[in-house]
């Protein structure tokens, strides 16, 4: 029985070294191949010119470098790029956001999501499966290769990664951490821990694991100033409440790459954007002594949602109150909304699973026919 070939794309440096040892080759050859794949974007063993002929032949027998197919890509007028990537009959989305002095890639970790936050369009898809480490890092590989070919009017270099795409990354810990290792490896993409941010809705035990095993920057999707409201809109709060979450955040801030935690707070009109909510949020964070930066995200409506985006006046009032009480507070600018790439739109049109599957397969068929 023929053994399945190992996909080298998702192996971090230690794992690829272990693989090379297992086939009787030296570690330094593993590092050569690792660099070819990620630093140079080469996935054909025959094009790896510093490898011997016998090694190239052995690799073709025992390994492969498989990149998922891009079903389609879009570019926004503001420099945002979006890719729909085929992951074996399902699809995930990856978004590049261009800002002054930085280029941020928003990476997905799951097909769908298990957490079903009430305001999130991705959660309405249900959950299909976790992405493999190869499928996670492939999003950066594809973006880096594509953006390097873009015309020279803008600098489309990926300088930052945010694990904020489809899915809850800490529910796919075993695959996300090796992928982030590759992102931060100097032989690959060379990003620092400060430039790679993982966003979680609050899988508390895994926050401690993340600090121990990776230590990337941490962002927390808080969205509510108390357990009663958070139980309603972020259901995982029923398992890990705000007290438990903030205790983990406090330790992470002490030992992580930043001396603060970024809290994401999606503003929804008359749900969590009242001045009383801002007052409660300030009291909460101060009482728990968590060094905090707050990122306010105006809600992006999608079909069928009961929630509304607040007025600019309500957003400004909320922000001003937080700033007046000593918190660094930003309001996320809407980018890529002309290509459905703005925050909260990663699921595209929210439809039932059957129609969504049919729409995806039609898009894939149309692409293959071209």
Curated annotation (Swiss-Prot):
Native organism: Francisella tularensis subsp. tularensis (strain WY96-3418)
HAMAP family: RNA_methyltr_RlmN
InterPro entries: Aldolase_TIM (IPR013785), Elp3/MiaA/NifB-like_rSAM (IPR006638), Methyltransferase_A (IPR040072), RlmN_N (IPR048641), RNA_MTrfase_RlmN (IPR027492), rRNA_lsu_MTrfase_RlmN/Cfr (IPR004383), rSAM (IPR007197)
Active site feature: 93 (proton acceptor), 343 (s-methylcysteine intermediate)
Residue ranges annotated for the Radical SAM core domain, each copy included: 99-337
E.C. designation(s): 2.1.1.192
Function: Specifically methylates position 2 of adenine 2503 in 23S rRNA and position 2 of adenine 37 in tRNAs. m2A2503 modification seems to play a crucial role in the proofreading step occurring at the peptidyl transferase center and thus would serve to optimize ribosomal fidelity.
Entry keywords, A to Z: 4Fe-4S, Cytoplasm, Disulfide bond, Iron, Iron-sulfur, Metal-binding, Methyltransferase, rRNA processing, S-adenosyl-L-methionine, Transferase, tRNA processing
Subcellular location per the Swiss-Prot or TrEMBL entry: Cytoplasm
SMART domains the record matches: Elp3 (SM00729)
Lineage per the UniProt record: Bacteria, Pseudomonadati, Pseudomonadota, Gammaproteobacteria, Thiotrichales
Cofactor list: [4Fe-4S] cluster
Disulfide bonds: 106-343
Recorded GO MF terms: 4 iron, 4 sulfur cluster binding; metal ion binding; rRNA (adenine(2503)-C2-)-methyltransferase activity; rRNA binding; tRNA (adenine(37)-C2)-methyltransferase activity; tRNA binding
Binding residues for [4Fe-4S] cluster: 113, 117, 120
The name this protein goes by in its record: Dual-specificity RNA methyltransferase RlmN
UniProt catalytic activity: adenosine(2503) in 23S rRNA + 2 reduced [2Fe-2S]-[ferredoxin] + 2 S-adenosyl-L-methionine = 2-methyladenosine(2503) in 23S rRNA + 5'-deoxyadenosine + L-methionine + 2 oxidized [2Fe-2S]-[ferredoxin] + S-adenosyl-L-homocysteine; adenosine(37) in tRNA + 2 reduced [2Fe-2S]-[ferredoxin] + 2 S-adenosyl-L-methionine = 2-methyladenosine(37) in tRNA + 5'-deoxyadenosine + L-methionine + 2 oxidized [2Fe-2S]-[ferredoxin] + S-adenosyl-L-homocysteine
Gene Ontology CC entries for this record: cytoplasm
Keyword Hydrolase: no
Co-factor remark: Binds 1 [4Fe-4S] cluster. The cluster is coordinated with 3 cysteines and an exchangeable S-adenosyl-L-methionine.
Residue positions binding S-adenosyl-L-methionine: 167-168, 199, 221-223, 300
């Amino acid at each position: 029985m023929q053994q399945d070939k190992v996909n080298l794309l998702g192996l971090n440096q230690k794992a690829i070294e272990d693989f090379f040892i297992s086939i009787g080759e030296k570690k330094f050859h593993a590092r050569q191949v690792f660099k070819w794949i990620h630093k140079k974007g080469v996935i054909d063993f025959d094009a790896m010119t510093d490898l011997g002929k016998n090694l190239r032949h052995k690799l073709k027998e025992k390994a492969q470098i498989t990149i998922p197919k891009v079903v389609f890509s879009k570019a926004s007028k503001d420099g945002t790029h979006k890719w729909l990537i085929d992951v074996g009959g399902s699809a995930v989305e990856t978004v590049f956001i261009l800002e002054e002095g930085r280029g941020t890639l928003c990476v997905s970790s799951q097909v769908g999501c298990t957490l079903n936050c009430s305001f999130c369009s991705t959660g309405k898809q249900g959950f299909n499966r976790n992405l493999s480490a190869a499928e996670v890092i492939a999003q950066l590989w594809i973006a880096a290769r594509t953006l390097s070919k873009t015309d020279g009017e803008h600098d489309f270099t990926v300088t930052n990664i945010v694990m904020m795409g489809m899915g809850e990354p800490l529910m796919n810990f075993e695959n996300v951490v090796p992928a982030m290792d590759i992102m931060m490896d100097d032989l690959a993409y060379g990003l620092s821990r400060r430039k790679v941010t993982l966003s979680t809705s609050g899988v508390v035990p895994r926050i401690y694991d993340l600090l121990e095993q990776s230590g990337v920057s941490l962002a927390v999707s808080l969205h509510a100033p108390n357990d009663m409201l958070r139980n309603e809109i972020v259901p995982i709060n029923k398992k890990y409440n705000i007290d438990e979450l903030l205790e983990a955040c406090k330790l992470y801030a002490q030992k992580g790459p930043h001396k603060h935690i970024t809290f994401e707070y999606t503003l929804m009109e008359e749900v969590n954007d009242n001045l009383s909510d801002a007052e409660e949020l300030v009291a909460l964070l101060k009482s728990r002594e968590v060094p905090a930066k707050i990122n306010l995200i105006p809600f992006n409506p999608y079909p069928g949602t009961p929630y509304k985006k607040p007025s600019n006046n309500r957003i400004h009032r909320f922000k001003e109150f937080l700033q007046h009480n000593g918190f660094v507070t930003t309001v996320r600018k809407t980018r890529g909304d002309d290509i459905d790439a703005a925050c909260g739109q990663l699921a595209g049109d929210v439809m039932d699973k059957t129609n969504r599957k049919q729409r995806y397969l039609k898009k894939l068929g149309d692409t293959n026919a071209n």
